[in-house]
């Protein structure tokens, strides 16, 4: 059976129907899936003139009965998650982490620290973005092998043991609120990173 090719208009109508049911209706999807639907609707217009893109935003919010503030908030979260999925920690993403990304985007001080661009939904400060992702993820650090003079000359150590896994510094959305309190204090951030402890950074 040949694949049916939908026009852009048909695809948009389908997304609106799904949105009425799963965003505005009584069979609501998870925040992530709601955000994905909104993203999918607007994606074809992201390189269009700004006026055309805003018109499609207005069409979407009027059809679904949601506010533009809610629409853009959900798009920020979805796009930040997509950036995480492109990072070195992509395989660690789980739906349970969505609340963390939501809280990040609620904090203007964190958005500023990331150099967040609300027009293109991306972080211009790539170094800080990578640091942030490392705080909410398990990471591996290199461990120097311990010299053992009793070993016979020529013995090789197992390269697989040279790295140790560290647990995430931040695992809960509420912890993002504490992070926002000292995100602009580089000394406190360094303490947090060195100690792998949000609490230690908070009191530094």
Model feature map: region roles:
Residues 1-77:
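Amphipathic, charge-rich alpha-helical segments that serve as recognition/docking helices
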Residues 58-63, 69, 73, 80-204:
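Accessory, typically intrinsically disordered or conformationally flexible segments
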């Amino acid at each position: 059976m040949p694949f049916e090719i939908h026009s852009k208009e048909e695809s948009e109508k389908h997304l609106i129907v799904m949105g009425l049911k799963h965003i505005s209706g009584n069979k609501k999807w998870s925040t992530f899936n709601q955000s994905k639907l909104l993203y999918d609707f607007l994606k074809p217009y992201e390189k269009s003139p700004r006026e055309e893109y805003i018109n499609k935003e207005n069409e979407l919010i009027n059809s679904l009965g949601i506010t533009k503030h809610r629409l853009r908030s959900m798009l920020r979260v979805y796009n930040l998650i997509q950036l995480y999925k492109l990072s070195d920690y992509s395989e660690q993403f789980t739906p349970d982490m969505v609340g963390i990304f939501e809280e990040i985007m609620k904090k203007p001080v964190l958005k500023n620290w990331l150099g967040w661009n609300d027009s293109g939904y991306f972080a211009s400060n790539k170094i800080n973005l990578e640091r942030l992702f490392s705080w909410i993820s398990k990471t591996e650090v290199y461990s120097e092998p311990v010299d053992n003079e009793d070993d016979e000359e020529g013995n090789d150590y197992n390269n697989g043991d040279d790295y140790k896994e560290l647990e995430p510094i931040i695992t809960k959305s509420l912890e993002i609120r504490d992070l926002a309190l000292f995100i602009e204090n580089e000394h406190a951030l360094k303490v947090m990173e060195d100690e792998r402890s949000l609490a230690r950074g908070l009191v530094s």
